[in-house]
């Protein structure tokens, strides 16, 4: 099945980066091997640029349960993150939804400083099937918002 529309006219999420990926899909279909499709683009992150930004990727807790996953949830107040303190932006919350049986990250919701950057790391983790323990135990630079992942994923229960 060929993709016949790109961008906003194609329906679905109306983000610039979706239009960019649509063009990659069409190029793959017209000039390549056709291997790039909407089905293999992976989890789609998005951010709403509030103060602090709100970013999301993957499933919500309710969606995960509805799909039959037994879930574990982790929550971390943004005020617990050293970089948030440095930035004086301690309002917010980080939340992750994990499959209780496989340890796979199913979704994340970040309402915190620099969430628009951090969400992309979690998108890659979802797409690559990286278990939450890898994110929990990784070494991150300090002070950065990404080091919040150590504490967030330690809170999985």
List each model region and its residues:
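Conserved small/polar residues in nucleotide/adenosyl-binding loops
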Residues: 1-5
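Internal hydrophobic alpha-helix adjacent to the cofactor/substrate pocket in enzyme cavities
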Residues: 6, 17-41, 70, 128
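Conserved phosphate-binding and hydrolysis motifs of nucleotide-dependent enzymes
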Residues: 7-8, 107
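Short beta-alpha connecting loops at secondary-structure transitions
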Residues: 8-11, 46
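Anionic group-transfer/hydrolysis microenvironments
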Residues: 10, 23-24, 97, 101
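Short beta-turn/strand-loop junction motif enriched in small, turn-promoting residues
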Residues: 11, 35-36, 41-42, 78-81
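An anion/pyrophosphate-binding glycine-rich loop and adjacent beta-alpha core
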Residues: 11-13, 17
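Flexible, glycine-rich terminal cap/loop adjacent to redox cofactors
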Residues: 44, 49-157
């Amino acid at each position: 099945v060929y993709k016949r529309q790109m961008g906003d006219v194609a329906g679905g999420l109306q983000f610039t980066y979706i239009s960019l990926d649509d063009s990659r899909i069409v190029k793959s279909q017209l000039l390549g091997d056709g291997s790039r499709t909407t089905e293999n683009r992976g989890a789609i992150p998005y951010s709403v640029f509030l103060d602090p930004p709100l970013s999301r990727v993957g499933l919500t807790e309710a969606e995960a349960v509805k799909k039959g996953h037994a879930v574990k949830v982790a929550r971390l107040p943004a005020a617990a993150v050293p970089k948030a303190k440095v930035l004086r932006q301690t309002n917010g919350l980080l939340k992750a939804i994990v499959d209780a049986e496989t340890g796979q990250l199913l979704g994340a919701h970040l309402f915190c400083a620099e969430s628009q950057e951090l969400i992309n790391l979690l998108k890659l983790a979802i797409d690559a099937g990286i278990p939450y323990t890898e994110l929990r135990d990784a070494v991150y630079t300090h002070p950065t918002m990404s080091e919040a992942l150590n504490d967030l994923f330690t809170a999985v229960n």
